[in-house]
Amino acid sequence: MTLLGPIFGNDPAAVAFVGGKERISYGRLCEDVDALAWWLHDRGIGAGSGLGIQFKGGLSYWVWVAHLAAIRIGARHATIDSLKSLRPAMGADGNQLDAYLFAGAALRNLPPSLRPLSIEPRGFGPLAEQLGVKPRAWTKPETECHAARIALTSGTTGRPHALLWTYDIMADRIAQAGSDIVNGAQERLCPLIGTGTTAGFRYPIAAWRAGAAVLSWSNGNDGRAVSHATVQRSTLLVISPANLRTIISSSKSSYQGHGGRTLIVLGARVPTSLRDAALRTMGARVNVHYGSTETGRVAGGDAALTDRHPGAVGFASGGATIEIVDADGVALPAGEAGIVRIRTPSMCGDYLPDGNSDRQSSIFKDGWFYPGDHGILFEDGLLAIEGRATETVNIGGIKISLPDIESRLLELPGIADACAIRVAHRKDDLLVIVLVSAQDHESKPLHEAIGKMVPKNTPFRIVKTRAIARNAAGKVQRDVLAQKLLTLIEKRETDG
């Protein structure tokens, strides 16, 4: 059975997609996918071709039609949101992508080798009519096995990298997500995370393979755009901690259907206060997952495990092997903190060439993937992540865990979002606390509360902002933010 075979075998009258008041049946979804498949075929895009996909604005349904059509015709495809993501997707030689399918405003300064293809779907009308193609079923099912996905890492270092998911790797990643579709065709999935992320890509396909409905969640990738009604319709939410916090803080009441709803939270640490708030207002079950674009899911479990350790992410899953090692690669005893390394049955072997081989060789080594995390593996197999190597910083000779500070900041009343950043100032390294809050950031009580969170005699500065920028996976791009903060601090010093 192919990846898309179960989708096309579903009851044509069953609901596949819900966007506001619009209901799209499986019959319509499949017709739209085939219409775009033929439209691309007629323009020379097929098995082995490379296709970048970017749809701006409230076009979540059509984004999915485009991705499914790319798989249908056997194309190698990538989800594009900027030139920053386009460059690694094209590869060092620029030969990974041949065409760029977009709706809305196109990216500027496209490489000459990339052929732009534009469609402008309006509303939810049948795509065959909108494209002016004859409605007909795709008659080349054998092409699908050539499909591949160019998956981009989250870019938490400020520099995204690309991996090639073969057809088999795609199938494995989607099967992992499928194990969470426990209600089968009765599931109503609301994926509150961007399509360009690993989870945002695989969960909807897994839901459709099970005959379930996918709920459109917003006009962008900002959790604040999610309607109360959309969440209430859902039985399964896939969400980042940042978006979860935003939704909870913006809602004045609990969500109906609470007892039949499960939340899967991934991408970062889940503070116990956030977990408890989610259990009170959103769902009866909160699960945490740990994994990466490079390896797929590595571990998972009930968020209650965070009572044992704030960074608990569950137990190994899907044939994953997890080790905690020292700097020389020697395995450490259970319960001892060290460097996390991972091996999974369908992990990628390397990034697509991008001229940064040193980074690649340090992350993929001797059949292991080193995600850059520090963690503990307990005797019973529980994995706890203490933070990324880059998130444990040295300020004034004292090592400080930024995630630990952030978790404690979010426990303070009136703090909607927060992050801690090390800024390399010309005089000395600085610990900068960035807050989204209605509080006066110069208030003495706030300074005293934060002072108790950091090591004694560690100086810090507080910067207040309207929002903390995060990527599609809900992660803060620390290097980018640190540079912006440095510029701000230097300007303040210059201005006096």
For each feature predicted by the language model, list its residue ranges:
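Conserved AMP-binding/adenylation subdomain of ANL enzymes
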Residues: 171-188, 196-236, 250
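Gly/Ser/Thr-rich phosphate-binding loop
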Residues: 235-238, 248-308, 321
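Conserved beta-loop-beta connector loops within the AMP-binding
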Residues: 309, 323-343, 379-380, 439-443, ...
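Conserved AMP-binding A3 loop
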Residues: 25-27, 148-175
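Conserved AMP-binding/adenylate-forming core of the ANL superfamily
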Residues: 13-44, 52-59, 66-68, 85-87, ...
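Conserved ATP/PPi-binding loop(s) of AMP-dependent carboxylate-activating enzymes
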Residues: 315-319, 330-362, 398-400
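Conserved pre-ATP/AMP-binding loop-to-beta segment of ANL
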Residues: 8, 12-13, 131-152, 159, ...
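AMP-binding/adenylate-forming catalytic core of the ANL superfamily
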Residues: 344, 350, 374-457, 469
